[in-house]
Every structure is written in structure tokens, then in C-alpha cells.
């Protein structure tokens, strides 16, 4: 921090005025400027040897230059001349605090400065820092508050408040002051990094993104990536991790791509035997297969893997490279549902975790475990050998202490463990497992809790009772953490938890038409219910929904379309059952594909993805063919002056992806017919037939809806129509009259017969009718 000298209110002699000018000109420069200014002030001293201002200014320059003895001598001389000179006391305090690292000695000088000027904000701030360095957080906060009262623009007091509140585990207050500090001093990368780790612990993802996106310290790239993961921006998160990996040594960087901790043996072997582009292609496929949504090219799962590796290096790789056993489990399975450690015992055990504990305890200790509450490992770990020695013929003592002579579980009433321990519970792996880790050598290197060794006293107690030591040893071996993990890895090599996500239900439909050059025009219509997108706390606002449409063939991504959709939310469109409709067009070769359609509201955990296997027929054949039937809300002739995003072949088709209508509403069906044959007069003649069925308790029954076919010369009503024309391909629509329709689900079948050669083709579609309001 720069030295701020108090305004000297005294009669200035010309040399003193010159000295003040020299100081001000040099204060914002560098060491050379300070050194030159100090020489100029020394040259002025013989003319004004008793000027406290001259000595104080000279001491300030020496302080900047880090010259402890010269600075201290000049400032002490200034105080000898004028003991009320606040700036001299302040400077001397900083000499003790910064150059001598003696915060206790600095306190009395800052206090002297404040006796001379109680509103001296910098002195309050430096006194606060001196108290903080002595561990006197309460006094430090009091002085920081005073500094802010007198000068709110100072940055240092906010940092001290942030750090002291963080030390007191008051993260809410700490975050407030860290943010205010960085607003005033955004260039402090070190403090910003500390702040980011606080935000990480508090899971303040939006703030973490805001801060880390402004930093250029490579150490914060994993923090930025983590924030991006929680924002749903997985490709950007993956890019941030790769930028971070590029700054690491080769041995460290390779840890992130190595899939050995999460892959099967054959996959790990394949990884080790590939290099270069072949390895990258292998990794792309590996992560795509494991990606639960398959809408980001595997980035969703891969970015999470990188995050876990970074977390394991940071938390579990301190004493062992690259990480101890906890890190290996964390990379494979992620954050446990419940965790308790010997350093931070977690006595709040959710019902799901308690169920896992109780089942394991019952298998190990029988009915004796019923009255015990477990707050640590259920599996017995090393304890003091004289704790609970009275075992009554079983591994459970008559005094209620479970376990063996030297190994016991950790319960609410008994923790005599002699080794550091951690207990992790995953409720969604193998119907729930507990994994216990211990640091047997007190080295900070945790491994699976070892299988206990029975003492002679343990065997003797079994012999006196009805239990079998061999049976108990068998259970200990079967339920040992190492054995449990080895068993579940063979069935579930990795885990990706989606439990924190909330569903965002929407509707979609996929329709296929003939395209150009032998391709198929795949049309995906999406309808987002406004009421599903909106949240209760939303004001009248516009929110962003990211829409993704991905087409896959196996693990290969054929096409990906991503777009951010602005959805307006206000009192007028809430609770109205309204839909925001979007259309995506994909040109693709015929064949079998997997379609993935995803919608996620940005900056929330609301997301939904739907998958569907598509068999896209080859419309390039010469036989009579019919496109998919599009159930629509309306079909009108397209206006060439106002093109619509829902237009196709001269028609403006308003999609109805939900395919839900109310009785009395019109229902339109758009279709395309291909490869009609002309007769000897160049005419085409074909017949369209429609059937509508619904399913009741008595089975399927046909419904006599009237269909109204659009014709250039008028409209024709009926369930079979004969049409004539001259084109071999037709695209048209008809309207169904739902005025008499009852609520329920209906199947529409359309059949086309070419009356020239008697070829027939058909398609079907579904729709529902809801009760009128």
C-alpha cells in the first residue's frame, strides 16, 4: 500500500514547499524516482534541519525504497521535532509493520497517529492490519470499520473484514466484503483468487463466474470452468480446463486425460496404446458414450471429469502424488451423498445415509447395532485397545460398545479412534455403500480402512459366546472398503449425478420430408410451456432458454444446433397454458439416427433432454411415398413479403408439437405426396382416405370426424377424397372438425392410393383433445 502522509497544516518555508513538491512529483513513480527525490530532499536538509515535514517526507521515500534503517531514522527525527505529527507516527508504524514484520511494535505508532488525528483513515486501516496479523480479529474489524467510516474509498479495510470473517467461518459476510474490496482494487489478483475459493465453497456460481472471467491468473481457470459447468456451459468449461492444462508440466497435464481411474480395463489399455489424433478420437468417443445428455459432444461429462481431477489434486494430492485413495474414489464417483471426518464430524445424518449405515451395521454387528447412531465409519477402524473391552461372546460389548478390542465403529456415544478417518456414503451405488478411509501412519495419506486383526481376547470372547469368529472375519472381508469398491467398480465404473437438476418439461416432434439431392429434410418443432420456464420469483422479465438439437449416429455427432431463445415472462402470459414455439431444420442422409433435444434455462438448474431413435426413410425411391403428417394449429398460404420461420413449400404452417387441442378448435394436417404417376393424358389421379381412432375400455373405435380438404375450386368434405392434378408431387393440407370431439387420445391414419397404378402408402400420427375451459 502507498504511504499517505497527512496534510501538514503549518507555516511552510520555501524549502519545505519545494520538498513537498518534490515528494508529490515522485510518489506515483518507481524506485528510481523515489531514489532521485530522496537525494534532492537530503540536499535541502542543511537549510532546514529542524523541519519535521522535511524529515517525514524523506522517511516516507525511504519506506518506499525498503530502506528500514534510513526510514526509521528520518521518521523518528521528525517525531523528536514535532511529536504531534500524525504522518510521521503513521510512517514509523508502517516501518515496523512492513519492513520489520513487528505488528505489535507497529500498534503504538498507529495509535499515536490517531491521537494526533482521530479521523486519519489510513492509520485506522493500518492499525486494523496490525491487529489482524496478531490474530486479534475483533479489534481488526473495529479499526477497519472506522477506516471505512472516515474514507469509504479505501480498499484495504474491506479486505481485512473479508479475511477475518472468512477465518471466523462467516462466509456470508466475507463474500460481501471481498466483493467490495475488489470493486475498489480489481488489480489484486491474489486476493481475488482467495475470494474465488470462498465463492467456490459457498457455491455462488454466478459471482464466481463474474470474478474469474475478469482474471488473467491461470490458477483461477479451474474455478472459471467450475462456474461454467454450473451455468450449463460445458463446452466453455472444457475449453477453460484445457487452457489451464496447457500451463501445467506434462506429467501433471496427462492426469486430466488419463481415463484409467474411470474406465474399464480394456478401455484403459486402449488409451495407453494410442497417441496423437488417434488418442483424441478415442477420448471423444469415450466421453460421448458416458455423456448422459449427448448434446455437447461429450463435453458435459468430460468437463466434470477434469473438475474432479483438479479437485482430487487440490484436496487429496497434498501428501501423495497424484492423490491418495480418496482422490481415486472421488474421480470415479464424484461428491458423496454424505461425508463425515475425524476433523469435521457430521452428526446430521440424512435418512437415506442412515439406511445405508443401518444395513451395514446389521450385517456386521447384528441386533446389537440397533441402539447406536453412527456419525463416522460403521466399518470398525483402529481404536484405543482399552476402550470397551467387555465383549460378550460376540463382537459387541455388553457395555454397548460395538466392534473388537482394537477396532470399532464411530458412534455418537463413542469415538476413541487413534487414526484420522473419513466416512463417505453413496446412496445410489449398489443400493448404497459406505467407504471408510483411514490415515494409519498419521502422514496425511489416506487409504481404505484395513481389515481388522482379531486379538486373542477377541477369539476368546467369541468362544464364550455363540458367535463364530470365522463368520465375523468373513463379513469383515466382504464389507472391507477395498473389497466393496473393487466389486462395485466392475459393475459401475463411474458415476455422474444428475440429482441436482430440475426437469424442464417441453414438447417436441420430429417430421421427415423429402429434401434435395437425395437428402431428407428433418424438421424438429419444439414448444416450451411458459409456465414451466417461469419461476415463482421471476418479475416481469425476459429469460434465456438454451435450445439444443443434436443428431447422432452411434457415438458420432452428425449435426448440432444450439441457440439461445429469449422468452418473455409477465403477468399476462403466466398460468395461461401458452407455448413458445421454435423450429429447427436439419438436412441429412436417410438412415438410422439418434435424436437428442435439450432445453435448459440459463443460470438455473432447470434442464430437460429427450431422446428418440429415428428411422429416416429414403424418399429418393420411385415408389409412391408419403411424408410424415404434421398436426398443426393452422395452415395458410405463405406471404412472400413476410416470410415465416414456419414456412414450407408455399405454406405457413403453425406447428403444434404438443398435439393437444380443445374441443371445437381447428386441427390441420399438412402432408406431402411423392411420385404420383401420370396417365396417358398427363393427369394424376389419386385418392386420400382418413381414419381417426380412439382407445376406450372396449378397445379401439373409429370416430366419424369430418375432414375438410382444401381445393383450389372449393372445399370437399368426407373421409375419402379423389384428387386430380398434373404434378407428380403434391403438398397440401386438410382440416379436421373437432366440434363433436370428446376429451381423449386419438390416432389419425392417412392413406394415399395412386389410381393410375393402384400403389398405396400410408402414415399415422397422434393427437389429444382436452376439455374446454
Positions of predicted regions on the chain:
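Structural marker of alpha-solenoid helical repeat scaffolds
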Residues: 47, 81, 116, 150, ...
